[in-house]
Amino acid sequence: MNSKIDAEVIVIGSGFAGIGAGIELKNAGFSFLILERATEIGGTWRDNQYPGIAVDITSFTYSYSFEQNPKWNHVFAKGKELFLYAHHCVEKYGISNNFIFGVDVEKAYFDENQAIWNIQAKDGRQFKSNIIISATGALTDPKFPEIKGIENFKGDLIHTARWNNTIDLKNKRVAVIGTGATSVQLVPSIAPEVKHLSVFQRTPIWILPKPDTAIPKSVQSLFSRIPFTQQAIRVITDKITETVMVTSVVHYKQVPFLVKAFEQLCLNFLRLQVNKKTTREALTPKYGFGCKRPSFSNNYLATFNR
């Protein structure tokens, strides 16, 4: 290895992308470091610990192809399971010593004369490499809405990306701002325990029924004994996920018949879930399916019957 560099490759971020990159780099024989600003690995599954958090792509697909997990407890794994899976992969593939924690990368520039990347952290530390892999994720820094007077609010302020587990919501008056994918999971999870729940919505979200179920121990045992069975299911879930994402989200304008079919499915589901007509109207999106990210839930819409 060139003595001028700390590693041939430096990966920034220790979520699923960073961990996966590290495993593949080790297999390919590269020297590498993974820089992480937090104190442990996990990415979004480390930072997000709000009630109801779960993956919204099937567990079979939301995992490394080279490290299938036969012990998933649900078709759509809960956040804690995914966090533990990430730790399992790091330990199994022996890359734990490649992480440097507490490194908040501030900037990086490429020295063309030496063909070396110079990476600088906020605390002044510097690292050099031939290659950088950015695995920082897109939504890493939470931000509260800019509401006038919010600094004078006397109650508790919680951001879902930095959930405070020491705050008990039982019998409290709670307001949730936003109706995106996180809210779809959070709202039905906290509704039964709070005294009063207000949900502030700017734009309704298209909701599809979620084909989720617990995976019996007998099926988990089958996956362990005959891995091909789980691999076959992954092929199916991969194709379904790719088809839905590519056709009805990425290229939704090119397949209007499919968009209409999904819209009708969502509207039928809305009618089954919500009793009051005015509430249904308030929860009905005014834009086409795929224009914004849809979500899956079997209990979000029904929560508004309370």
Annotated model-derived regions:
Residues 3-5, 14-16, 20-40, 134-272:
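Rossmann-like dinucleotide-binding core of oxidoreductases
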Residues 11, 16-99, 202, 273-278:
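Beta1-alpha1 glycine-rich phosphate/pyrophosphate-binding loop at the start
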Residues 16, 45-47, 72, 106-120, ...:
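Tryptophan-centric aromatic hotspots in well-structured domains and transmembrane helices
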Residues 69-88, 254-262, 288-299:
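Short beta-strand to alpha-helix junction loop
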Residues 74-140:
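Feature captures the FAD/FMN-dependent oxidoreductase FAD-binding
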Residues 92-94, 148-152, 301-305:
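Short, conserved catalytic or adaptor-binding loops enriched in Gly and charged residues
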Residues 260-306:
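Alpha/beta-hydrolase fold catalytic core
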